[in-house]
């Protein structure tokens, strides 16, 4: 796909852009779009790319810069058509927590409540099991035709969008390693190929909660919660309070929530620790078969928040009740089985059912 057609800033090449950021100056959105277009088109040298990313990192990326970069990521992505009302539950990763797969399990529960979920993700960054790892262990075919991803999204109400398959331009970035987090750690959750207009987005550091809400506002999101747990999780945590930046009706507000608001007891952090993909897959199967405990509680809390963002629950308590019913009725287990079945099927010319 072509990149955004909006006019760029005054800078016209990577050398000029690099000089500006190296001097400690911020780029405007158009200049940032130009820079990332150059990088993702393979027209920046490794040294230019590394220097640019580190200069942004040292100074601190701005809302303009993140927005401009995300526009390029979105424009270059291979898209997937999604139903109206689709939500994404995604995190930046990198929180180093090693928990069970929380947002992935919550995504299945949300879909079982009737809300389409375009789950955008990748393999593990900070744990032994990322979204792709655990879904693969559950039997989802991660290499299925993209037509089947679309079919799953419409028919099972959940599709897994494997980031490297949709963001081919990232191949031009992959060889560059600067040994620390960069803006690209933030861009994945902002670049859903299904153009989901509603997001529950977890971040690895509290400093990004409010800025990313403003980025999503600029990118046209209708509603979003950007969250960071007080224990460091890029999820809504059950061990204590969670900082939330809410995008609603074009306004961004920041507040804290507590698990008790959903009727959920606080948990000890060690009860959320997971294992490798197979251990975490078994935990998800047990959860959908009715297992109780801290893992169920944190999945319920995150699903409840997503249902609220999706406009399907007035508050966390109502969202929690809907999520509980989705698990206890067997609907979540059925959705997972449907997802596995579709991704392991053959492409047909049958029309995709509307939700």
Curated annotation (Swiss-Prot):
Query: Which EC number(s) are documented for this chain?
Result: 2.4.2.18
Query: What residues bind Mg(2+) 1, as annotated?
Result: 103, 235
Catalytic reaction equation(s): N-(5-phospho-beta-D-ribosyl)anthranilate + diphosphate = 5-phospho-alpha-D-ribose 1-diphosphate + anthranilate
Q: Does the keyword Secreted apply?
A: no
* Recorded family membership: Belongs to the anthranilate phosphoribosyltransferase family.
Q: Name one GO biological process term.
A: L-tryptophan biosynthetic process
For this UniProt record, the keywords arranged alphabetically read as follows: Amino-acid biosynthesis, Aromatic amino acid biosynthesis, Glycosyltransferase, Magnesium, Metal-binding, Transferase, Tryptophan biosynthesis
GO MF annotations in UniProt: anthranilate phosphoribosyltransferase activity; magnesium ion binding
Query: How the protein assembles, per its UniProt entry?
Result: Homodimer.
Kindly list the positions annotated as binding anthranilate 2: 177
Function of the protein:
Participates in the tryptophan-dependent indole-3-acetic acid production, which is a phytohormone released by A.brasilense.
The reply on keyword Glycosyltransferase is yes
Q: How is the cofactor bound?
A: Binds 2 magnesium ions per monomer.
Pathway recorded for this protein: Amino-acid biosynthesis; L-tryptophan biosynthesis; L-tryptophan from chorismate: step 2/5
Q: Which GO terms describe its cellular component?
A: cytosol
The residues listed in the UniProt record as binding 5-phospho-alpha-D-ribose 1-diphosphate, with positions renumbered to this chain, are: 91, 94-95, 99, 101-104, 119-127, 131
**Name of protein:** Anthranilate phosphoribosyltransferase
Q: What class of enzyme is it?
A: transferase
Required cofactor names: Mg(2+)
Binding-site residues, Mg(2+) 2: 234-235
Detail which positions bind anthranilate 1. Answer: 91, 122
- Identify the gene encoding this protein: trpD
Q: Which SUPFAM superfamilies match?
A: Nucleoside phosphorylase/phosphoribosyltransferase catalytic domain (SSF52418), Nucleoside phosphorylase/phosphoribosyltransferase N-terminal domain (SSF47648)
